[in-house]
Amino acid sequence: MSIDDKVRAIVKEFKAYVPGKSKEEIARNYGIDPEKIIKLGSNENPWGCSPKIAEKLMNEVSNLHQYPQPINPELMDEISKFTKMPTENIIVGGDGADEVIDNIMRILIDEGDEVIIPIPTFTQYAISAKIHGANIKWAKFDEENGFKLDVESVLNNITEKTKVIFLCTPNNPTGNVIPTEDIKKIVESTDALVMIDHAYIEYSKGEYDLTNWALKYDNVLVLRTFSKVFGLAGQRVGFGVTSKKIVDYMMRIKPIFSLTRASQVSAITALQDKEFFDRCLKEGIESREQIYNGLKKFKQLEVYPTEANYMLVKVKNGMNSSEFCEALLKKGVIVRDCYSFEGLEPYYFRISIGTFEENERFLKIMSEIVE
């Protein structure tokens, strides 16, 4: 008997997650100087993280032989101040918000339970749901209506087997927010857990931030992350805000030391450096407008309005998305080909914000490809 005979059937069906490409990969494959590559494919903060973090990490080096605190009171207090939520309603995870998603699946999903996922959206929801034995009911962000959430497609899929409903707002990769009244309708129509993914909420208008719904509704969990505005994608820190009961259940099965000492120090320092956070957010929104206005000038592209640090673009010049993205790669520009997103035709790519100088170079290269 080979190992193949022992592997779970659901795992054999899986296709590996397709992440954004790295500068190192493109430098190797195309022989381009890494310093000249423009990376606009992974929704990162192009200005990096707080410069104060480097000093704090140097001071932490002498402690790396020690296990981290399973729960860091200082980090919990800083997150509480940032979100204006009680610490007992917060759970922090390593591996970004992905750990929180996985832990929710672990405490709620039995084989044959159902989850509802509107598509196109973040692919990790489906990966985690499937590996934990859930059946997925697909709802939709309606392409013909500017990718607005089709609320009825969610409501019509709710059954007694529904355990979790995923709502990403701003949605990845489309960039649009789900109207608050639509989310309220869904939350109040079911006792299933509604996971509201706010990974990019800082870039949207304040009225769309529903983090405080974790106190208003027992069946809401709001996901947040340090990977975007805070510039800590490489440290993998995320957290959930939800009811005390759900936090208690998650703490029972949460990996004990998933958040490293370095990650904890980085997150605390990032939260304390409000000046850097505010500057990154302000310049991030300005960068988004620079790219959006620049791309709108190309008739061969359809650019979708966005409330995130990226935007979705449809190619209309006869090329598919893979051909278009390959043309950009050859010129040293990394964007995200969206062919792997369930529910999207093969003509879409996603572009993240860059520095103002990177944006100018990118738009010049775009003009060489589409005109």
Curated annotation (Swiss-Prot):
Protein's UniProt name: Histidinol-phosphate aminotransferase
Query: What PANTHER family does UniProt report for this protein, alphabetically?
Result: HISTIDINOL-PHOSPHATE AMINOTRANSFERASE, HISTIDINOL-PHOSPHATE AMINOTRANSFERASE-RELATED
This protein's species is Methanococcus maripaludis (strain C5 / ATCC BAA-1333)
The EC number(s) given in the record are: 2.6.1.9
Question: Can you cite a GO biological process for this protein?
Answer: L-histidine biosynthetic process
Q: Which gene codes for it?
A: hisC
HAMAP family hit by this protein: HisC_aminotrans_2 (MF_01023)
Task: Name the reaction it catalyses.
Answer: L-histidinol phosphate + 2-oxoglutarate = 3-(imidazol-4-yl)-2-oxopropyl phosphate + L-glutamate
**Chain positions with N6-(pyridoxal phosphate)lysine modification:** 228
- State the UniProt keywords alphabetically: Amino-acid biosynthesis, Aminotransferase, Histidine biosynthesis, Pyridoxal phosphate, Transferase
Q: In which pathway does it act?
A: Amino-acid biosynthesis; L-histidine biosynthesis; L-histidine from 5-phospho-alpha-D-ribose 1-diphosphate: step 7/9
Top-level division of the source organism's lineage:
Archaea
Q: Which InterPro entries match?
A: Aminotransferase_I/II_large (IPR004839), HisP_aminotrans (IPR005861), PyrdxlP-dep_Trfase (IPR015424), PyrdxlP-dep_Trfase_major (IPR015421), PyrdxlP-dep_Trfase_small (IPR015422)
**Family of the protein in this entry:** Belongs to the class-II pyridoxal-phosphate-dependent aminotransferase family. Histidinol-phosphate aminotransferase subfamily.
Which cofactors is this protein said to need?
A: pyridoxal 5'-phosphate
Q: Which GO terms describe its molecular function?
A: histidinol-phosphate transaminase activity; pyridoxal phosphate binding
The record, for Gene3D superfamilies, names: Aspartate Aminotransferase, domain 1, Type I PLP-dependent aspartate aminotransferase-like (Major domain)
